[in-house]
């Protein structure tokens, strides 16, 4: 992505200070923190110097994100398709877990089979820094094209799989790598087209994963019953391919990326900034509280609320449907009260609902009510978690810093299932202990992110940020 070229050290520091606390304007960092433009060895590479001068001239006439227009909303459309096909697909993995245990992998334990969806979630977020660096240098198109190929090819191979390692490699690795290349670039592109309406645009994009989380499980379950597992996967792969063609044609950054290597010092910079480090710590803790209900609510409904098997399976679809409205509402609310404020409030409400509603949910009606409340409140986590680093990151490092946040999310996403299982198995009152753990993680994570927000706003609590 295009960058601003700094002057002397004092000017660079002043630019960073001016932009750091503005919630409506990402900070801009110079390419170097020492030396002036005249000290660059431009003569060594005349073509690179001309490219840099052209980039500087384009930026000098840049009037900022348009916050609308045909091109901007077409980017949102393509990003919605990416969201539908990446986290929306991941949200359907429960359908495969049940089928694998019943048919092709019935000789394997549930914990062994669980590695397939766990790896998908891990790759979705864990490849974030690598995907981010590629995005910053070359833009979204190579990633989206490559991700589409990996995702579709992995699903086609999974439709032919017969053994455990074939399912693991095709769906848990190949398809998952493709998924990782789709979501982050689309999310980062939206931030270059929108500023004042960025929350709403990201909220609209995030509804794609909710719609996918509702459509894919129902489609896969019904097609396995009627047409068999292989054609269920192939049909899903063809649907994903069609939507990703739209994404390839519409998702593009507002400014042409300038390939350049990020200095090693800048790679480590996010971890040395107290406010950003607090943000990472808060998101790490918060993720545990967000993912435990998603994974364990159907089992809780079956064992505690004595729901039927069919009804307990529909709890995930109910959560995703409620999450759709939560993501839209959080996006529009973020443009009014600030992205950080909206995120912290919604995640705090999620923690309270885990403690106040999920713990006493021993009846079907209460469990369904909790699924709706949790889905609506947790929608802000999905729609706004990428907006937090965007609002405080230098534009040249946008993809990389967003990737770091996703990498932090990947660790709890990978370890959450065994931790939750251990709590259920070894705690004296397993379900209550698990629900308390989820609620406390949400509240503690929200409090830490509030601390990060206070550092960014110089301890001003009443401020749209």
Curated annotation (Swiss-Prot):
Glycans are attached at residue 310. Induction: The fujikurins gene cluster is specifically expressed during rice infection. GO terms for cellular component: plasma membrane. One of its GO terms (molecular function) is transmembrane transporter activity. It comes from the Eukaryota. PROSITE patterns: MFS (PS50850). Residues 11-28 have a biased composition (Basic and acidic residues). It is found in: Cell membrane. Keywords: Cell membrane, Glycoprotein, Membrane, Transmembrane, Transmembrane helix, Transport. It is a multi-pass membrane protein. Belongs to the major facilitator superfamily. Monocarboxylate porter (TC 2.A.1.13) family. PANTHER family: MAJOR FACILITATOR SUPERFAMILY (MFS) PROFILE DOMAIN-CONTAINING PROTEIN-RELATED (PTHR11360:SF224), MONOCARBOXYLATE TRANSPORTER (PTHR11360). This is Fujikurins efflux protein FFUJ_12242.
């Amino acid at each position: 992505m295009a960058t601003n070229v700094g002057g002397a050290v004092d000017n660079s520091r002043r630019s960073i200070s001016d932009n750091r606390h503005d919630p409506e304007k990402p900070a801009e960092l110079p390419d170097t923190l020492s030396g002036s433009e005249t000290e660059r060895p431009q003569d060594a590479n005349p073509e690179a110097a001309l490219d840099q001068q052209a980039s500087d001239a384009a930026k000098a006439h840049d009037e900022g994100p348009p916050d609308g227009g045909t091109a901007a909303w077409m980017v949102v459309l393509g990003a919605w398709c990416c969201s539908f096909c990446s986290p929306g697909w991941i949200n359907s993995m429960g359908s495969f877990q049940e089928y694998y245990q019943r048919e092709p992998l019935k000789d394997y334990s549930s914990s062994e089979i669980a590695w397939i969806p766990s790896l998908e979630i891990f790759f979705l977020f864990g490849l974030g820094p690598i995907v981010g660096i590629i995005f910053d240098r070359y833009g979204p198109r190579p990633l989206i094209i490559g991700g589409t190929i990996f995702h579709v090819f992995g699903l086609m191979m999974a439709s032919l799989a017969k053994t455990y390692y074939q399912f693991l490699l095709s769906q848990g690795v190949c398809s998952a790598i493709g998924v990782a290349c789709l979501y982050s670039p689309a999310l980062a592109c939206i931030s270059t087209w929108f500023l004042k309406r960025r929350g709403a645009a990201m909220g609209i994009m995030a509804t794609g994963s909710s719609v996918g989380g509702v459509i894919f499980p129902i489609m896969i379950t019904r097609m396995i019953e009627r047409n068999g597992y292989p054609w269920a996967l192939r049909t899903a792969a063809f649907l994903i391919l069609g939507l990703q063609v739209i994404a390839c044609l519409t998702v593009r950054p507002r400014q042409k990326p300038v390939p350049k290597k990020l200095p090693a010092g800048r790679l480590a910079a996010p971890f040395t900034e107290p406010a950003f480090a607090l943000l990472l710590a808060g998101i790490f803790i918060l993720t545990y509280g967000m993912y435990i209900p998603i994974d364990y609510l159907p089992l809780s409904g079956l064992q505690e609320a004595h729901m039927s098997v069919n009804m307990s399976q529909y709890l995930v679809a109910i959560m995703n449907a409620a999450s759709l409205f939560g993501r839209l509402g959080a996006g529009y609310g973020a443009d009014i009260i600030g992205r950080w404020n909206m995120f912290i409030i919604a995640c705090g409400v999620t923690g309270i609902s885990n403690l106040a509603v999920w713990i006493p949910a021993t009846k079907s009606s209460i469990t369904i009510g909790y699924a709706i409340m949790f889905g609506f409140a947790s929608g802000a986590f999905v729609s706004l978690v990428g907006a937090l680093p965007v609002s405080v990151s230098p534009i040249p490092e946008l993809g990389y810093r967003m990737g770091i946040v996703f990498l932090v999310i990947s660790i709890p996403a990978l370890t959450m299932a065994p931790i939750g299982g251990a709590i259920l198995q070894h705690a004296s009152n397993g379900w209550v202990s698990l629900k308390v753990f989820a609620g406390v993680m949400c509240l503690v994570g929200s409090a830490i992110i509030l601390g990060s927000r206070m550092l960014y706003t110089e301890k001003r609590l009443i401020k749209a940020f």
